[in-house]
Amino acid sequence: PDHWHCMQMVDAVAAGKDVYVEKPIGNSIRECEIMVAAAKKYKSVVQVGQWQRSQQHFRDAMDFVHSGKLGKIRLVKAWAYQGWMKRIPVQADANVPTGVHYDKWLGPAPKRAFNPNRFHFNFRWYWDYAGGLMTDWGVHMLDYALIGMKVSDPVSVMAAGGKFAYPDDAAE
């Protein structure tokens, strides 16, 4: 889960390893700063998992954008409509499943009772473990935009969000 990325990556580079870390690199700006500092300190190669960069249709699209055939690009907007999200029903806390070492799964996250909603895939929708759709899918949309413009940082950012659907479900 995302909440482990910082600790695992720092431990790995401290052990002299090069690292492939899945996106998002960290759960906070501070975690990302710690990770970048560790990679520099231990002179490790670190790659962040942006899998779409390896897809041929993505490379073809970037080649087209970079060809100049679109003219001068003045504005880039990135968004995603997610039609696969489903309501997460409220469930009571439960016993930890057999074979799961829940304390190790929690790791650096705050200690909370086990709840099936905050485990496996759905951990993404709980702040203790991840950053919701922005860090799960938004990082890819921003990556497309930045590569398309051949920049590493945006000039400005505007974001809007909220819990507009399923107001009574269990997601945070």
Sequence positions of predicted segments:
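Short, solvent-exposed loop/turn and secondary-structure capping segments
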Residues: 6-11, 31-32, 58-59, 86-91, ...
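Basic phosphate/pyrophosphate-binding loop/patch that engages nucleotide-derived ligands
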Residues: 37-44, 60-75, 93-96
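Core domains of carbohydrate- and sulfate-ester-processing enzymes
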Residues: 77-119
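Active-site-proximal cap/loop segments of hydrolase catalytic domains
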Residues: 29-32, 38, 58, 119-122, ...
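Rossmann-like dinucleotide-binding domain that binds NAD(P)(H)
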Residues: 103-172
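Structural recognition of the beta-strand scaffold that forms the well-ordered cores
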Residues: 19-21, 27, 45-48, 74-78, ...
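Beta-strand-loop-alpha-helix segment that lines the small-molecule cofactor/substrate pocket
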Residues: 2, 6-54, 68
